[in-house]
Amino acid sequence: MGQILYQLDDNSLTFPLIECALTEPNGLLALGGDLSPERLIAAYSQGIFPWYSDNDPLMWWSPNPRAIIDIDQLRINRTLRKAINKSPYQITLNQDFSQVTQLCANAPFRTDGTWILPEMEAAYLTLHQQGYAHSIEVWYTDEHDNKALVGGLYGVAVNGFFSGESMFYKQSNASKFALIALGQLLKSVDINFIDCQLLNPFLEDMGAKETSRDIFIHKQQHALTKTMPDDFWQPRTLTVI
């Protein structure tokens, strides 16, 4: 395809075909638009996500290849299994979405500047309130009964498709526990993969791999046909096994 960068129409939710995304930078598809819930849901339903930094225009991406985790291949090595068996953590679903996004935005391991800007936090909070964005929280209670959020992740779900957005940790293995809990939760209703968008060393260590955009879209479109139980995303405590 020709290397054309599209400008979104503010009055339309239509995106260009994902095959039109640039090869350099990989996956950049369009500029502009807004972070309204309707546009975000339209984007995620087509395998497109926003990603930009402060002072940049709003940019929309659909990279090729795409990073995913096949849940059956989620990697739990012997050391991590021992940590799970002796876990001091409590893991919950959708109990503090706002704090998870704030801590992801300010995670100390970010070295290239945060991309979770205040307007993005607000947009995803609105999606959460509408039932499309969800969080996993990992809590630790110390010997003085002080409870703190020490790890977590959040992402966007449209029917059976879940796209992970960001995660953080303050204690060893906390973000791994969150990812495993998410995988086991999705697997319980026969959802077999998590969209990771872009590969990084942490995700690769947990079993993520890159796949072609065509294969990703095929898997995604199948996931979008799945109907979720009405109470699936209700706030509750989760157990990692």
Swiss-Prot record:
Q: What does this protein do?
A: Functions in the N-end rule pathway of protein degradation where it conjugates Leu, Phe and, less efficiently, Met from aminoacyl-tRNAs to the N-termini of proteins containing an N-terminal arginine or lysine.
UniProt source species: Colwellia psychrerythraea (strain 34H / ATCC BAA-681)
Localisation: Cytoplasm
Name this polypeptide is given? Leucyl/phenylalanyl-tRNA--protein transferase
Alphabetical list of InterPro entries matching this protein:
Acyl_CoA_acyltransferase, Leu/Phe-tRNA_Trfase, Leu/Phe-tRNA_Trfase_C, Leu/Phe-tRNA_Trfase_N
Alphabetically, which GO biological process terms does the record hold?
protein catabolic process
The protein's matches in Pfam families, at most eight in alphabetical order, are given as: Leu_Phe_trans
Keyword Acetylation on entry: no
What are the protein's UniProt keywords? Acyltransferase, Cytoplasm, Transferase
The record's catalysed reaction(s) read: N-terminal L-lysyl-[protein] + L-leucyl-tRNA(Leu) = N-terminal L-leucyl-L-lysyl-[protein] + tRNA(Leu) + H(+); N-terminal L-arginyl-[protein] + L-leucyl-tRNA(Leu) = N-terminal L-leucyl-L-arginyl-[protein] + tRNA(Leu) + H(+); L-phenylalanyl-tRNA(Phe) + an N-terminal L-alpha-aminoacyl-[protein] = an N-terminal L-phenylalanyl-L-alpha-aminoacyl-[protein] + tRNA(Phe)
The entry lists its GO molecular-function terms as: leucyl-tRNA--protein transferase activity
**Family statement drawn from the similarity comment of this UniProt entry:** Belongs to the L/F-transferase family.
Q: Does the keyword Transport apply?
A: no
Q: Which E.C. number(s) belong to this protein?
A: 2.3.2.6
